Amino acid sequence: MAVLKMPRFKKYHLRLMITCFSTLLLMTYWEKIDNCVVTHVMSFSYRYLFNSFKFINSSFIVNPEDAIKYNHRYLINHQTKCDNKDILLLLFVKSSSENFERRQAIRSTWGNETYIESTLGVTVKVLFALGLHPIPEERGKLKEDLMFEDQKYRDLIQQDFIDTFHNLTLKLLLQLGWKETYCHHAQFLMSADDDVFVHTPNLILYLQGFGQSNTRDLWIGGVHRGSPPNRDKESKYYVSRDLYPWLSYPDYTPGSGYVLSRDVVSRIYQASLTINASFHIDDVFLGICAKMMDVSPTDHAFFSGEGKAPHHHCIYSLMMTSHGHVSDIHEMWRHARNAEDVLISSGLFRRLYCTAVKVRLLCVPFFSNSYPCKAAFFEEDT
């Protein structure tokens, strides 16, 4: 009998060891599991079941006296940049003082105002939004370089806040305030990072499709819905529960690239004057301001927030933005201007071919792509 009971005892012992090991493993990695899985489930539930963000009106309001501290002095400004112009798009590029080569690359490629006006037939104004270098010694060295650069190109807008990740909301306020004050008549505002490639031919064609000057309620980009606050203290995106105790952010578009119509800029700017700008994640801050004004973003499959677009003419023909481009920006611009890479000819075979290519490039399981899988089925007139 004892011989018969031994295997049963070993099986029980094995189950106990597996249970203990699993429990220990769960306890060890619970914070990561919580951040990656549980918080997303909770935030999505909050977003889609409750969808209540009434707290914004009470918790984020600041009085005018406190709001003044977020107004910063212009060190470099061009008040007449938009004078006497019928401007389709004001395009602000968020840059850092030391990123001269990135600005040069943009000026000679997708941000070339002369090319856009002569070839695409519209007026677009491109400006670079800057703060102060965080290191005082470097700040002094860069001051003269920036003055020389601006004398040549006349496209820098700088305020006297320290240019760090945790002050990106101040850079957003710079863009909104400058648009409202000096370029109110521009039909659209775009904000982009200086490592983003903007396919200006596609973007201009897309914006022209909305008509002349009466477009309203437009906020377009790659929309994040039901995103949870990051509670990992080691992350630069960390937000404490004291600062933001709720389970989900309002809908927002990544700061790497999005477009707002003139009326939306005005409404969000007015909201920003009454909301606590110490919230340092600029794209979420934009979403909070927009929610307060009852403005919702529209998702566009080819606005990239996460990474580089795959190289293929079936992608270039629909691309709006692609993130993470510095060394290859000239190659991207060559493709953007190449009619073979830009135009999808009519015909069922070509459409089927490009759909198959996009499925292969964008719908890879367990792989983070620049565009979502649904972009594979995106059409030009969508």
UniProtKB/Swiss-Prot annotation:
Enzyme class: transferase
Reactions listed under catalytic activity: a beta-D-Gal-(1->4)-beta-D-Glc-(1<->1)-Cer(d18:1(4E)) + UDP-N-acetyl-alpha-D-glucosamine = a beta-D-GlcNAc-(1->3)-beta-D-Gal-(1->4)-beta-D-Glc-(1<->1)-Cer(d18:1(4E)) + UDP + H(+); a neolactoside nLc4Cer(d18:1(4E)) + UDP-N-acetyl-alpha-D-glucosamine = a neolactoside IV(3)-beta-GlcNAc-nLc4Cer(d18:1(4E)) + UDP + H(+)
Pathway: Protein modification; protein glycosylation
Superkingdom as given in the UniProt entry: Eukaryota
Keywords: Glycoprotein, Glycosyltransferase, Golgi apparatus, Membrane, Signal-anchor, Transferase, Transmembrane, Transmembrane helix
GO cellular component: Golgi membrane
Cytoplasmic compartment spans: 1-13
Residue ranges the record marks as coiled coil: none
InterPro entries reported in the protein's UniProt record: Glyco_trans_31
One protein family per Pfam: Galactosyl_T
Keyword Methyltransferase among record annotations: no
Any one GO molecular function term: lactosylceramide 1,3-N-acetyl-beta-D-glucosaminyltransferase activity
Lumenal side: 31-382
GO biological process: protein O-linked glycosylation
Transmembrane parts of this sequence: 14-30
Localization terms from the record: Golgi apparatus membrane
Membrane-topology descriptor: Single-pass type II membrane protein
Residue positions with a glycan: N57, N112, N167, N276
Main subcellular location of this protein, as a coarse class: Golgi
EC number: 2.4.1.206
Family stated for the protein in its record: Belongs to the glycosyltransferase 31 family.
Role: Beta-1,3-N-acetylglucosaminyltransferase that plays a key role in the synthesis of lacto- or neolacto-series carbohydrate chains on glycolipids.
Name of this chain's protein: Lactosylceramide 1,3-N-acetyl-beta-D-glucosaminyltransferase B
Organism: Danio rerio (Zebrafish)
Gene from which the chain derives: b3gnt5b
